[in-house]
Amino acid sequence: MLKIGLVGCGAIASLITKALMSDRLNKAEVLAFYDGNLEKAEKLAMETGADFCKSLDELVSKDLDLIVECASVNAVEDTVIKSLNNDKDVIIMSVGAFADKDLFVKLYKLAEKLGKKIYVPSGAVAGIDAVKSGSLGKISEVSLTTTKPVHGLKSALEEQGLNTDEIKEPKIVFEGTVFDAISKFPQNINVSVVLSLASRYPAKVKIIADPNAVVNRHEILVKGSIGTIKTCVENNPCRDNPKTSALAAYSVIRLIKDLSEPVRIGT
Protein backbone atom coordinates (compact mmCIF):
# COMPACT_ATOMS: atom_id res chain seq x y z
CA MET A 1 0.00 0.00 0.00
CA LEU A 2 1.36 3.39 -1.05
CA LYS A 3 0.73 5.84 1.80
CA ILE A 4 0.07 9.39 0.60
CA GLY A 5 -0.15 12.86 2.11
CA LEU A 6 -1.67 15.81 0.22
CA VAL A 7 -0.56 19.44 0.40
CA GLY A 8 -3.36 21.67 -0.84
CA CYS A 9 -7.00 20.67 -0.40
CA GLY A 10 -8.88 22.25 -3.29
CA ALA A 11 -10.72 20.74 -6.24
CA ILE A 12 -7.74 18.77 -7.55
CA ALA A 13 -7.01 17.21 -4.15
CA SER A 14 -10.65 16.19 -3.84
CA LEU A 15 -10.58 14.51 -7.27
CA ILE A 16 -7.40 12.61 -6.43
CA THR A 17 -8.76 11.44 -3.09
CA LYS A 18 -12.09 10.27 -4.49
CA ALA A 19 -10.40 8.40 -7.33
CA LEU A 20 -8.09 6.52 -4.99
CA MET A 21 -10.93 5.72 -2.59
CA SER A 22 -12.95 4.19 -5.44
CA ASP A 23 -10.02 2.18 -6.83
CA ARG A 24 -10.88 -1.50 -6.47
CA LEU A 25 -7.20 -2.49 -6.43
CA ASN A 26 -6.72 -0.29 -3.37
CA LYS A 27 -2.94 -0.06 -3.73
CA ALA A 28 -2.68 3.61 -2.74
CA GLU A 29 -4.44 5.62 -0.05
CA VAL A 30 -4.47 9.24 1.11
CA LEU A 31 -3.83 9.18 4.85
CA ALA A 32 -3.24 12.85 5.69
CA PHE A 33 -4.05 16.38 4.50
CA TYR A 34 -2.57 19.83 4.98
CA ASP A 35 -3.61 23.18 3.56
CA GLY A 36 -2.72 26.76 4.49
CA ASN A 37 -6.48 27.14 4.85
CA LEU A 38 -6.90 24.74 7.76
CA GLU A 39 -10.67 24.55 7.30
CA LYS A 40 -10.23 23.02 3.84
CA ALA A 41 -7.85 20.36 5.15
CA GLU A 42 -10.09 19.57 8.10
CA LYS A 43 -13.16 19.26 5.87
CA LEU A 44 -11.48 16.84 3.45
CA ALA A 45 -10.04 14.83 6.33
CA MET A 46 -13.45 14.49 7.95
CA GLU A 47 -15.00 13.38 4.65
CA THR A 48 -12.41 10.65 4.16
CA GLY A 49 -11.45 9.60 7.68
CA ALA A 50 -7.84 10.64 7.08
CA ASP A 51 -5.65 12.73 9.40
CA PHE A 52 -5.89 16.51 9.48
CA CYS A 53 -2.53 18.23 9.90
CA LYS A 54 -2.12 21.76 11.21
CA SER A 55 1.27 22.30 9.60
CA LEU A 56 3.41 21.03 6.75
CA ASP A 57 5.96 19.84 9.30
CA GLU A 58 3.31 17.68 10.95
CA LEU A 59 2.32 16.17 7.59
CA VAL A 60 5.83 15.25 6.44
CA SER A 61 6.69 13.74 9.83
CA LYS A 62 3.96 11.11 9.46
CA ASP A 63 4.51 7.54 8.25
CA LEU A 64 3.96 8.27 4.56
CA ASP A 65 5.67 7.19 1.34
CA LEU A 66 4.67 10.03 -0.95
CA ILE A 67 3.67 13.68 -0.68
CA VAL A 68 1.52 15.19 -3.44
CA GLU A 69 1.65 18.97 -3.84
CA CYS A 70 -1.47 20.47 -5.39
CA ALA A 71 -1.43 23.88 -3.74
CA SER A 72 0.43 26.63 -5.63
CA VAL A 73 3.82 27.55 -7.08
CA ASN A 74 4.57 29.37 -3.82
CA ALA A 75 4.20 26.11 -1.87
CA VAL A 76 6.58 24.05 -4.01
CA GLU A 77 9.98 24.87 -2.53
CA ASP A 78 9.00 24.35 1.10
CA THR A 79 6.97 21.23 0.29
CA VAL A 80 9.75 19.56 -1.69
CA ILE A 81 12.55 20.39 0.75
CA LYS A 82 10.64 19.21 3.82
CA SER A 83 9.34 16.08 2.06
CA LEU A 84 12.78 15.02 0.83
CA ASN A 85 14.41 15.75 4.17
CA ASN A 86 11.81 13.53 5.83
CA ASP A 87 12.60 10.60 3.51
CA LYS A 88 9.58 11.02 1.25
CA ASP A 89 9.22 11.20 -2.51
CA VAL A 90 7.07 14.03 -3.84
CA ILE A 91 4.78 14.74 -6.81
CA ILE A 92 4.61 18.37 -7.94
CA MET A 93 1.47 19.65 -9.67
CA SER A 94 2.42 23.33 -9.57
CA VAL A 95 5.33 22.68 -11.90
CA GLY A 96 5.36 26.33 -12.91
CA ALA A 97 7.70 26.80 -9.95
CA PHE A 98 10.38 25.01 -11.98
CA ALA A 99 10.50 27.88 -14.46
CA ASP A 100 12.92 29.21 -11.83
CA LYS A 101 16.06 27.41 -13.01
CA ASP A 102 17.95 28.03 -9.77
CA LEU A 103 15.14 26.47 -7.73
CA PHE A 104 14.94 23.48 -10.06
CA VAL A 105 18.69 22.83 -9.78
CA LYS A 106 18.59 23.26 -6.00
CA LEU A 107 15.78 20.72 -5.56
CA TYR A 108 17.28 18.35 -8.15
CA LYS A 109 20.57 18.25 -6.25
CA LEU A 110 18.82 17.74 -2.91
CA ALA A 111 16.80 14.79 -4.25
CA GLU A 112 19.95 13.31 -5.78
CA LYS A 113 21.87 13.70 -2.53
CA LEU A 114 19.12 12.06 -0.45
CA GLY A 115 18.29 9.33 -2.97
CA LYS A 116 14.67 10.44 -3.28
CA LYS A 117 12.43 11.24 -6.26
CA ILE A 118 10.60 14.34 -7.47
CA TYR A 119 7.85 13.42 -9.94
CA VAL A 120 6.34 15.83 -12.47
CA PRO A 121 3.13 14.48 -14.08
CA SER A 122 2.35 15.06 -17.75
CA GLY A 123 -0.55 17.32 -16.85
CA ALA A 124 -3.14 18.42 -19.38
CA VAL A 125 -1.16 17.74 -22.57
CA ALA A 126 -0.46 14.71 -24.76
CA GLY A 127 2.81 13.52 -26.22
CA ILE A 128 5.16 14.20 -23.32
CA ASP A 129 6.53 10.66 -23.60
CA ALA A 130 7.48 11.27 -27.26
CA VAL A 131 8.96 14.67 -26.44
CA LYS A 132 11.10 13.17 -23.66
CA SER A 133 12.42 10.52 -26.04
CA GLY A 134 13.01 13.09 -28.77
CA SER A 135 15.04 15.25 -26.39
CA LEU A 136 17.81 12.65 -26.59
CA GLY A 137 18.37 13.96 -30.11
CA LYS A 138 18.61 17.61 -31.12
CA ILE A 139 15.58 19.84 -30.54
CA SER A 140 15.31 22.98 -32.68
CA GLU A 141 11.82 24.31 -31.92
CA VAL A 142 9.21 23.94 -29.18
CA SER A 143 5.94 25.85 -29.10
CA LEU A 144 2.66 25.71 -27.20
CA THR A 145 -0.57 27.42 -28.18
CA THR A 146 -3.21 27.35 -25.47
CA THR A 147 -6.81 28.49 -25.93
CA LYS A 148 -9.05 28.76 -22.88
CA PRO A 149 -12.49 30.17 -22.06
CA VAL A 150 -12.22 33.75 -20.86
CA HIS A 151 -13.61 32.90 -17.42
CA GLY A 152 -10.80 30.38 -16.92
CA LEU A 153 -8.23 33.16 -17.39
CA LYS A 154 -10.26 35.86 -15.66
CA SER A 155 -8.22 36.40 -12.48
CA ALA A 156 -4.86 36.45 -14.28
CA LEU A 157 -6.13 38.84 -16.96
CA GLU A 158 -7.69 41.21 -14.46
CA GLU A 159 -4.46 41.31 -12.47
CA GLN A 160 -2.84 42.57 -15.67
CA GLY A 161 -5.45 45.31 -15.99
CA LEU A 162 -7.54 43.71 -18.74
CA ASN A 163 -11.33 43.99 -18.65
CA THR A 164 -12.51 40.47 -19.53
CA ASP A 165 -16.04 41.73 -20.23
CA GLU A 166 -14.65 43.52 -23.29
CA ILE A 167 -13.32 40.32 -24.88
CA LYS A 168 -16.00 39.48 -27.46
CA GLU A 169 -13.93 37.32 -29.83
CA PRO A 170 -10.78 35.14 -29.59
CA LYS A 171 -7.95 37.37 -28.39
CA ILE A 172 -4.22 36.69 -28.03
CA VAL A 173 -3.54 37.75 -24.44
CA PHE A 174 0.05 36.54 -24.27
CA GLU A 175 2.85 35.67 -26.66
CA GLY A 176 6.38 35.10 -25.42
CA THR A 177 8.69 32.83 -23.44
CA VAL A 178 7.72 30.08 -21.03
CA PHE A 179 9.32 32.10 -18.23
CA ASP A 180 7.13 35.15 -18.81
CA ALA A 181 4.06 32.98 -19.40
CA ILE A 182 4.22 31.24 -16.04
CA SER A 183 4.97 34.54 -14.31
CA LYS A 184 1.81 36.14 -15.69
CA PHE A 185 -0.42 33.03 -15.68
CA PRO A 186 0.83 30.92 -12.72
CA GLN A 187 -2.40 28.94 -12.39
CA ASN A 188 -3.17 28.49 -16.07
CA ILE A 189 -0.09 27.47 -18.03
CA ASN A 190 1.86 24.90 -15.99
CA VAL A 191 1.85 22.71 -19.10
CA SER A 192 4.35 25.07 -20.74
CA VAL A 193 6.90 24.25 -18.05
CA VAL A 194 6.21 20.50 -18.30
CA LEU A 195 6.82 20.75 -22.05
CA SER A 196 10.04 22.72 -21.57
CA LEU A 197 11.38 20.28 -18.98
CA ALA A 198 10.53 17.27 -21.15
CA SER A 199 12.12 18.75 -24.27
CA ARG A 200 15.00 20.45 -22.45
CA TYR A 201 14.23 23.45 -24.63
CA PRO A 202 12.41 26.66 -23.61
CA ALA A 203 8.98 26.70 -25.20
CA LYS A 204 7.49 29.64 -27.05
CA VAL A 205 4.01 30.21 -25.65
CA LYS A 206 0.85 31.77 -27.07
CA ILE A 207 -2.29 32.10 -24.93
CA ILE A 208 -5.68 32.87 -26.47
CA ALA A 209 -8.75 33.90 -24.49
CA ASP A 210 -11.90 32.81 -26.32
CA PRO A 211 -15.34 33.85 -25.01
CA ASN A 212 -16.96 31.06 -27.04
CA ALA A 213 -14.62 28.26 -25.96
CA VAL A 214 -15.97 25.48 -23.76
CA VAL A 215 -12.75 23.43 -23.56
CA ASN A 216 -9.10 24.07 -22.76
CA ARG A 217 -7.16 23.51 -25.98
CA HIS A 218 -3.40 22.81 -25.99
CA GLU A 219 -1.49 22.54 -29.28
CA ILE A 220 2.12 21.36 -29.12
CA LEU A 221 4.72 21.57 -31.87
CA VAL A 222 8.21 20.12 -31.42
CA LYS A 223 10.81 19.93 -34.20
CA GLY A 224 14.22 18.31 -34.11
CA SER A 225 16.46 15.56 -35.39
CA ILE A 226 13.75 12.98 -34.67
CA GLY A 227 11.30 14.77 -36.97
CA THR A 228 8.17 16.67 -35.97
CA ILE A 229 5.80 16.04 -33.08
CA LYS A 230 2.36 17.64 -33.20
CA THR A 231 -0.36 17.08 -30.63
CA CYS A 232 -3.65 18.78 -29.91
CA VAL A 233 -5.78 18.12 -26.85
CA GLU A 234 -9.17 19.65 -26.10
CA ASN A 235 -9.74 19.16 -22.39
CA ASN A 236 -12.88 19.68 -20.38
CA PRO A 237 -12.15 22.20 -17.62
CA CYS A 238 -12.16 20.86 -14.08
CA ARG A 239 -15.74 21.33 -12.88
CA ASP A 240 -14.77 22.96 -9.58
CA ASN A 241 -11.67 24.78 -10.88
CA PRO A 242 -12.00 26.02 -14.48
CA LYS A 243 -8.44 27.41 -14.39
CA THR A 244 -7.19 23.88 -14.97
CA SER A 245 -8.23 20.78 -16.91
CA ALA A 246 -9.70 17.60 -15.49
CA LEU A 247 -6.96 15.73 -17.36
CA ALA A 248 -4.35 17.44 -15.16
CA ALA A 249 -5.84 15.77 -12.10
CA TYR A 250 -6.17 12.45 -13.89
CA SER A 251 -2.50 12.56 -14.88
CA VAL A 252 -1.56 12.70 -11.19
CA ILE A 253 -3.91 9.84 -10.38
CA ARG A 254 -2.41 7.79 -13.22
CA LEU A 255 1.11 8.53 -11.96
CA ILE A 256 0.18 7.39 -8.46
CA LYS A 257 -1.26 4.19 -9.90
CA ASP A 258 1.93 3.62 -11.91
CA LEU A 259 4.00 3.98 -8.75
CA SER A 260 1.85 1.42 -6.95
CA GLU A 261 1.53 -1.19 -9.72
CA PRO A 262 4.09 -3.79 -10.91
CA VAL A 263 3.90 -2.90 -14.62
CA ARG A 264 4.29 0.60 -16.06
CA ILE A 265 3.33 1.43 -19.64
CA GLY A 266 4.90 4.34 -21.50
CA THR A 267 8.15 6.25 -21.16
Curated annotation (Swiss-Prot):
Pathway: Cofactor biosynthesis; NAD(+) biosynthesis; iminoaspartate from L-aspartate (dehydrogenase route): step 1/1. GO terms for biological process: NAD biosynthetic process. Transmembrane segments: none annotated. Coiled coil: none annotated. Pfam families: Asp_DH_C (PF01958), NAD_binding_3 (PF03447). One of its GO terms (molecular function) is NAD binding. The active site is at H218. Its EC number is 1.4.1.21. It catalyses: L-aspartate + NADP(+) + H2O = oxaloacetate + NH4(+) + NADPH + H(+); L-aspartate + NAD(+) + H2O = oxaloacetate + NH4(+) + NADH + H(+). Keywords: NAD, NADP, Oxidoreductase, Pyridine nucleotide biosynthesis. NAD(+) binds at A124, N190. It is an enzyme of class 1 (oxidoreductase). SUPFAM superfamilies: Glyceraldehyde-3-phosphate dehydrogenase-like, C-terminal domain, NAD(P)-binding Rossmann-fold domains. The iminoaspartate product is unstable in aqueous solution and can decompose to oxaloacetate and ammonia. Specifically catalyzes the NAD or NADP-dependent dehydrogenation of L-aspartate to iminoaspartate. Belongs to the L-aspartate dehydrogenase family. This is L-aspartate dehydrogenase.
